[in-house]
Regions:
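N-terminal Lys/Arg-rich, disordered targeting/topogenic segments
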Residues: 1-16
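Hydrophobic membrane-insertion alpha-helices, especially the h-region
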Residues: 22-35
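N-terminal accessory beta-strand-rich subdomains and adjacent acidic, glycine-rich linkers
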Residues: 36-387, 769
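Active-site-proximal substrate-binding groove within the catalytic cores of carbohydrate-active enzymes
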Residues: 87, 92-101, 287-319, 496, ...
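Solvent-exposed loop/turn segments at secondary-structure junctions
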Residues: 95, 104, 176, 204-206, ...
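Conserved beta-strand positions
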Residues: 218, 443-445, 489, 571-573, ...
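An active-site-proximal structural segment forming one wall of the substrate-binding cleft
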Residues: 371-381, 422-425, 429-432, 545-569
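Aromatic-lined carbohydrate-binding/catalytic grooves of carbohydrate-active enzymes
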Residues: 390-478, 482-549, 576-580
Length: 782
């Protein structure tokens, strides 16, 4: 008899099991939804790509020189000719020359008499004869240098191609053999009406057998001058500076500065000196009989400018640009420095490194001529628009409204926002300034939204209620306008404080290449000198927003600010900070970041609001109405001979500029600073709070230790009266001349006929038959 089978019947699932499985199911669904959100919102977001630009690599043809019975440059072949210039080359040496038909001057890429140099040793002699130097890493991350003469031309490892209005040299540097590291680099010359365009398109660079080019120095001795020449080099040091030829400062370091400052992701955390960045992508060489303006047209964000004098490496005074093609980063493997390895970016930055050498005629002499030519070019390109004349210059002042401070509730610490200046009090400041005779005023309102001065990321706009809310903000704007001024609201897009709990630092922050960690910065710790400190306040530390997500934040802000009745937007960082993102899966170079930034400046301009930039770089000029914290001096470098208002000579009459905060100028220096404002043609600029500045002593803004409006009102009005007394006659006028005279006297000339003499000495001085009082100025032609 067969045994019967019993069927087991499952009982009902226990309540506990059902709850656990339900929780797990919800968790899986939530996790899946979040992953979808994460990938859509962060990984696949690519709006920044809409702003990226590209370039084309021109196909080469057979090089054919232009026949010429009597060459203007002996032993050279004619390549191209324009209305003003002739382009020549010497195929045996790859030297290029530009002959100026207007004055008969010839400018060479390399000195023809290099062998006669009295200073250059073997390596420097090689450099004198080279069109560029390249710096590279090998497969073991050991760096080296190659120069075109010894590593290419001398070996006859180069060829020539014809291109439109020019010539392309193809250099093969190194040992061209199996398994030997070598490089192929194109160098292009194109002639235009009054300038030569020189470029190295990185798409044409080839690297063989584990060689990695990380920097190229281009045409180190183009237009270089000798001991016999008189003149100077113009460099974009702060406001601008000059280095006199043969100035004898042979122990001083050469001038070398990154354009738009070094990429924060390539900079050292340790800050040993604080320098004003180079805001202009240009330099110049000014001789008695000719002047050459050099502008970096493409790749400026990855470039630096170097200048030096004769008697150090060779007999020449020189200036040249260098371009960074990639960086190497430290990767710490096991927690201590002994395990550090160099990680090299695999691909060079895709950029058409382009430099324009403009040969100026007698109309554009000296550094004033360089500035005038460049300004006229920007006007012609639609990047600068002439301002209308006004009765007075504007008075600039920042108003700190909301500030974060630590508070406690039931033993828990948190940040809350308190008012240093609410919107009604800011109205009172504007009214009192107007009553003091300051009708033309520009208010920069800081800390008005999203939690105060160190506000949360700007994808939302929450106007702080305790300050007065939206209605109070618009009433404040109405008051400033009625007083004859403009009000700008301040916003930081790229520097996001660590106090913002809603920002996804891991996904949206810019990252380093080596270890891949998020870049974080802060203030300088006076003990360690590292620039990553909060000095006790988390708000002082910040992450840098990746350029990938900049369009999202700017777009959302632009949509919201357009609905608020304020005159302008003050950009705390967008016009002056340029950062890459070295995230390995989606790397964005500084040059690509520049494309994105320009696109966002256009978006903000389209809101119809005026734009203010903070010490704006030259790429922001086309969008900027006003500039605060404009450079009014150069960095005190030993090789520098004098500071000049190069920045202001380009912008004055087209963009209104203001100085840095005058609250923090030493009282003994204030008289000289006031004269400095008059010389450079910039307005005074203060920072105010209605409450006493001591209220901020236990906040992240304790460095603003003297801002109380009631203490500064009379002093500010007096300073404004002094500066306005001179500059009100040149509002809307272009600065066309600047002369450094004897005995600490400066002469500034404007295109409306006004001339201002400034005397920095403590005795009255004579200039052009006029007497200028001690520590004062004199107006002529008003």
């Amino acid at each position: 008899m067969k045994a019967s089978k019993e069927k087991k019947i499952k009982g009902p699932m226990s309540l506990t099991k059902r709850i656990v499985l339900g929780i797990l199911a919800v968790a899986v669904i939530v996790g899946a939804v979040y992953m979808i959100y994460y990938f859509v919102h962060y990984v696949f977001y690519d709006k920044h790509e809409e702003y990226l630009t590209s370039y084309e690599y021109e196909p080469g043809s057979v090089y054919t020189p232009i026949a010429e019975a009597q060459p203007d440059v002996p032993d050279f072949e004619l390549v191209a000719e324009s209305g003003y210039l002739k382009l020549y080359t010497q195929p045996s040496t790859a030297i290029v020359a530009v002959y100026d038909k207007r004055n008969g001057e010839t400018t060479y890429t390399n000195p023809l008499n290099a062998d006669e140099d009295t200073v250059a040793n073997g390596a420097n002699m090689n450099y004198l004869k080279s069109q560029f130097l390249l710096y590279y890493y090998n497969e073991e991350a050991v760096s080296g240098t190659m120069a075109t003469f010894n590593d290419c031309v001398r070996k006859n490892q180069f060829s020539m191609e014809g291109i439109e209005n020019g010539v392309r040299y193809m250099y093969h540097l190194g040992e061209i053999a199996d398994n030997q590291m070598h490089f192929e680099v194109p160098l292009e010359y194109r002639l235009h009406e009054d300038y030569l365009e020189v470029s190295i398109p990185t798409c044409g660079i080839k690297e063989y057998n584990n060689g990695y080019i990380y920097r190229i120095q281009l045409l180190r001795y183009m237009g270089a001058t000798s001991y016999d020449d008189k003149g100077y080099i113009v460099v974009p040091n702060g406001s601008g500076s000059i280095i006199n030829f043969n100035n004898g400062k042979r122990t001083a370091a050469s001038y070398s500065q990154y354009i738009y400052d070094i990429d924060p992701l390539a900079a050292n955390y340790t800050t040993t000196e604080i320098l004003d960045p180079a805001r202009l992508a240009l330099f110049g060489i000014c001789k008695e009989n000719y002047d050459m303006l050099v502008t970096v047209e493409d790749g400026a964000s990855n470039a630096l400018i170097t200048a030096g004098i004769s008697g150090v490496y060779n007999d020449l005074n020189y200036a040249y640009p260098s371009f960074v093609l990639r960086v190497a980063d430290n990767l710490r493997m096991f927690g201590d420095s002994s395990s550090d390895v160099y990680v090299i970016e695999p691909n060079p930055y895709d950029v058409n490194m382009t430099v324009r050498y403009t040969f100026l005629d007698q109309k554009y002499k000296g550094y004033a001529g360089l500035a005038t030519y460049y300004r006229e070019r920007l006007v012609e390109e639609g990047k600068l628009t002439r301002l209308e004349e006004t009765e007075d210059i504007p008075f600039f002042y920042d108003v700190i409204a909301g500030v974060k401070e630590n508070a406690h509730f039931l033993g828990a610490q948190y940040l809350h926002t308190f008012s240093m200046t609410d919107f009604e009090e800011a109205q009172q400041i504007s009214n009192e300034l107007a009553a003091s005779g300051i009708g033309s005023q520009v208010m920069n309102l800081q800390g008005w939204f999203n939690g105060g001065y160190y506000h949360d990321a700007a994808d939302t706009v929450r106007i702080t209620g305790k300050l007065g809310g939206k209605s109070g903000l618009e009433k404040l704007n109405e008051t400033v306008t009625a007083n004859g001024g403009d009000m700008y609201v301040d916003v930081a897009f790229q520097q996001v404080t660590f106090a913002d709990d809603g920002f996804n630092y891991g996904a949206e922050g810019a990252r380093y290449y080596g270890a891949g960690y998020v870049a974080s910065f802060g203030l300088i710790n006076p003990t360690t000198l590292r620039n990553t400190s909060g000095l006790g306040y988390v708000e002082n530390r910040y992450s840098l927003l990746s350029p990938k997500f900049l369009p999202r934040y700017v777009g959302k802000f632009a949509g919201k600010i357009g609905k608020i009745d304020v005159t302008g937007i003050s950009l705390r960082d967008l016009g002056s900070v340029l950062v890459s993102d070295k995230k390995r899966t989606n790397q964005i170079t500084r040059e690509a970041a520049l494309d994105v930034v320009l696109g966002q400046l256009g978006i903000l301009e389209s809101t119809g609001k005026k734009l203010m930039t903070n010490a704006g770089n030259d790429y922001s000029f086309a969008y900027t109405d006003t500039i605060i914290n404009a450079p009014i001096s150069g960095n005190s470098l030993p090789i520098i001979d004098a500071d000049i208002p190069l920045y202001e000579m380009i912008t004055h009459g087209y963009i209104t500029s203001a100085s840095g905060h005058l609250n923090f100028v030493n009282r003994d220096d204030m008289a000289a600073t006031t004269l400095n404002l008059i010389e450079f043609g910039v307005s005074p600029h203060y920072v105010f709070t209605w409450e006493r500045s001591s209220e901020m002593k236990n906040t992240a803004l304790n460095r603003f230790y003297t801002t109380t409006f009631s203490n500064w009102k009379d002093t500010a009005a007096e300073t404004y009266e002094q500066v306005n007394g001179a500059l009100k006659y040149v509002t809307g006028a272009a600065m066309i001349g600047h002369d450094i005279l004897d005995n600490d006297v400066r002469k500034v000339t404007y295109d409306n006929g006004v001339v201002i003499y400034i005397n920095y000495s403590r005795q009255e001085q004579q200039a052009d038959g006029l007497t200028i009082p001690a520590m004062s100025y004199r107006l002529e032609g008003k």
